[in-house]
Amino acid sequence: MSKVIGIDLGTTNSAVAVLEGKEPKIITNPEGNRTTPSVVAFKNGEIQVGEVAKRQAITNPNTIVSIKSHMGEEGYKVKVGDKEYTPQEISAFILQYIKKFSEDYLGEKVTDAVITVPAYFNDAQRQATKDAGKIAGLNVQRIINEPTASALAYGLDKDENDEKVLVYDLGGGTFDVSILQLGDGVFQVLSTNGDTHLGGDDFDKRIMDWLIQNFKEENGVDLSNDKMALQRLKDAAEKAKKDLSGVSSTNISLPFISAGEAGPLHLEADLTRAKFDELTDDLVQKTKIAFDNALSDAGLSVSDIDKVILNGGSTRIPAVQKAVKEWAGKEPDHSINPDEAVALGAAIQGGVISGDVKDIVLLDVTPLSLGIETMGGVFTKLIDRNTTIPTSKSQIFSTAADNQPAVDVHVLQGERPMAADDKTLGRFELTDIPPAPRGVPQIQVTFDIDKNGIVNVSAKDMGTGKEQKITIKSSSGLSDEEIKKMQKDAEEHAEEDKKRKEEVDLRNEVDQLIFTTEKTLKETKGKVPETETKNVQDALDALKKAQKDNNLDEMKEKKEALSKAAQDLAVKLYQQNGGAQGAAGQAGPQGAQGGQPNNDNGSSNGQGGSTVDGDFHKVDPDK
């Protein structure tokens, strides 16, 4: 097998490495640099990538930066002249450039690659990254999480004892914290948390905003509407940020930044590290949320962590290093360049794939829960967040109406209990279901997540064997804000969500109990005296009235009364008929209390679980 290169496709910069012998090595770009700016420019019909594109960004409006922030974002396109480009296409230009200079270095054609993504990337963002590789002419052998890759680079597989490692990854535009357990060559991710729209760019912007505000106060000129000035400010802010990692104060000088009535205006400012820390303190503190959540999800405390790794160029910021040291209670490991660790680790994984590296196993996790919408708008999870991948989970669902010919499977991703609050990944139909009473057809829904975190969903009618499948496409990806909002909302609205879920469950139970009781009464009509069924009928009428009045307290009370009356009737039927018919009668009303998902996570084939009423809508066969 030919060489498998490892690519860190970053927001601000990208890097590539390859395994030479048993050690990974960074491949330098044509300018001799070990990282390449993730910048693409269009000029006179030519596509420029990297250093040359970044250098002319000030004068060329057709320059695209930080495209990674838009990967998987539905409908997002960049317009250049009369042509539009998706984030995948722009990323592919960067990957093509990396592929070319890697081939020049290796002296052979490169076809295979391992590409890294932030641990908190969702399905759409991962799929978009894989598509970008495909567009660039690369066979993406594996998509792996950046923290896992950096752990590989630190050589932690060489440690004999089991270790729990916290990876704090703050890049140019994304941030996440992952907890890994390492030992005997196995790299198992225990949890991950983060924000796909927080990084060094945000720190740069704070400096830019400060410069703009000061300049406006001194000169009465607002630079925020001047595109050329903004690009110069961005470059100056990025340089100042880097300078302040090594010195306590830096001078920012931008001559001829604008013009006033008296002539040219120049920007001069001294920025101290203390002022920079003040401007960005809330950004640093914001990362503490993911830090705490990752530990909580892993069921660990900081005292359980054996080693802390800082990853991503933005972890060079002294305030970030100080904060992580305080939170973790130990000095982070600085032994590898944080800009290069991910690419080096990806190259090691490439060596695993090519067979050059043995005895290493990666066990990543899915960052968000996956499931479908069921009756009453409930989000029924099939795969919980932080589940080790690859994985597969099946569950049996059923129809919500008699003689329902088709079911609509609504696939969702998120953490909220109600489907309306989560993100739609896709929909598909399973048709030609034979006529049958509600609750009788058995529809097996299966979720498969592969080693790259890509989701496939299928629905199968167990009666006919007919099956429908879907691979979730990247156009349905979550935006940065949506991911952030999901978990924030889940925490803030936990009580509200619980109440709404309980209400929906009650309504579903009432519907099912009424349906089953009416069916039982119809079947026993003429077979037993009406005096025997009067209590059940009265209780049924009372429950239907409470349902019509939409009185939740009454519904709960009357549901319990009907359940008791139905059970009493079942006992009498059992005594009269020697057991057989009575047992069936008891199973009817009592079974009506079900309709909840099977929570047996130990089962992956869905067999033996209870049946769930799906949110499957009636389809008109004539349409």
UniProtKB/Swiss-Prot annotation:
**Region described as Disordered:** 470-504, 578-623
Q: Which UniProt keywords apply?
A: ATP-binding, Chaperone, Nucleotide-binding, Phosphoprotein, Stress response
SUPFAM superfamilies under this entry? Answer: Actin-like ATPase domain, Heat shock protein 70kD (HSP70), C-terminal subdomain, Heat shock protein 70kD (HSP70), peptide-binding domain
- Which top-level group of life is the source organism from? Bacteria
PROSITE patterns linked: HSP70_1, HSP70_2, HSP70_3
Q: Where is the composition biased (Low complexity)?
A: 578-604
Q: Name one GO molecular function term.
A: ATP-dependent protein folding chaperone
Q: Which residues carry this modification: Phosphothreonine?
A: 174
Q: Where is the composition biased (Basic and acidic residues)?
A: 481-504, 614-623
Can the keyword Transport be found in this entry's annotation?
A: no
Q: Does the keyword ATP-binding apply?
A: yes
Record's note on what induces expression: By stress conditions e.g. heat shock.
Please explain the role this protein plays, according to its UniProt record: Acts as a chaperone.
PANTHER family noted in UniProt = HEAT SHOCK PROTEIN 70KDA
Output the NCBIfam families linked to this UniProt entry: PRK00290.1 (NF001413), prok_dnaK (TIGR02350)
Family affiliation: Belongs to the heat shock protein 70 family.
UniProt protein name: Chaperone protein DnaK
Species in which this protein is naturally found? Lactobacillus gasseri (strain ATCC 33323 / DSM 20243 / BCRC 14619 / CIP 102991 / JCM 1131 / KCTC 3163 / NCIMB 11718 / NCTC 13722 / AM63)
What is the gene called?
A: dnaK
